[in-house]
Amino acid sequence: MAQTENQKSKRIPLGKDVSTQRRLSKARRHFRLRKKIAGTTERPRLVVHRSSRHLHAQLVDDTVGKTIAAASSIEPDVRAVEGDKTAKGKKVGELIAARAKAAGVEAVVFDRGGHDYHGRIAALADAAREGGLKF
């Protein structure tokens, strides 16, 4: 069955839907950010990954390509936290700060992973600062 001209114009071109644009915009923001920052042994990169359900944080030394410490909302003690996802993000921030201190890390470079500094990302960063990490 042939499509009329009106039906063709209503189709959204491939790659132009909202979710694809949002994903590509996030990737562009993260790429721009990664051009400017890198983690060292003295000041590793605090990488944050956010999914719709969980939050992951890692301390990465980019000079040798190793993860120094990690924390995630998948861990049992974080899952046990009552409250919303922001409260769990705060707990992940506290955990990563404690693990960084145990590894001898005082200062970090914050890599928000292309996400807006808002909500869970901001809660994690604030909790890490309160835990003693310097950004």
From Swiss-Prot:
GO terms for biological process: translation. It comes from the Bacteria. InterPro entries: Ribosomal_uL18_bac-type, Ribosomal_uL18_bac/euk. CDD domains: Ribosomal_L18_L5e. GO terms for molecular function: 5S rRNA binding; structural constituent of ribosome. This is one of the proteins that bind and probably mediate the attachment of the 5S RNA into the large ribosomal subunit, where it forms part of the central protuberance. NCBIfam families: L18_bact. Pfam families: Ribosomal_L18p. Keywords: Ribonucleoprotein, Ribosomal protein, RNA-binding, rRNA-binding. This is Large ribosomal subunit protein uL18. It comes from Nocardia farcinica (strain IFM 10152). Residues 1-25 are annotated as: Disordered. Part of the 50S ribosomal subunit; part of the 5S rRNA/L5/L18/L25 subcomplex. Contacts the 5S and 23S rRNAs. Belongs to the universal ribosomal protein uL18 family.
